[in-house]
From Swiss-Prot:
Protein name: Ribonuclease P protein component
Keyword RNA-binding: yes
Catalyzed reactions per annotation: Endonucleolytic cleavage of RNA, removing 5'-extranucleotides from tRNA precursor
Organism field: Nitratiruptor sp. (strain SB155-2)
Function: RNaseP catalyzes the removal of the 5'-leader sequence from pre-tRNA to produce the mature 5'-terminus. It can also cleave other RNA substrates such as 4.5S RNA. The protein component plays an auxiliary but essential role in vivo by binding to the 5'-leader sequence and broadening the substrate specificity of the ribozyme.
Lineage summary: Bacteria, Pseudomonadati, Campylobacterota, Epsilonproteobacteria, Nautiliales
Amino acid sequence: MKGVQTLKTKREFDYVYKRGIAFHSPYFVLFYIPDKDMRIGFVASKKVGKAVQRNRAKRVLKALFIQYFDQLPIGRYVFVAKPKLLGADFKRIDQEMTKILERIKRRKW
């Protein structure tokens, strides 16, 4: 995962939200913009739960990102957790990520 930077400021996140393409799944939303460098952000709002649940949701999303890092095109990503994420097993979340990855690859940029 060398060369990956995190999105830090509200301005950086807002840029990806407004200009990026949203890929929805029952467990998370992935915003993506093609870019020259790899930048990533993870978000879990209070709708997901209290701090412990939000942190767990972000860890699950980060594990997905690490697992698929080599297959993802370079760009800016924001993973937004949905409340259903914590109730699902990792295998189902993994299947959804595979579907989204295929949609990203099929899209013409």
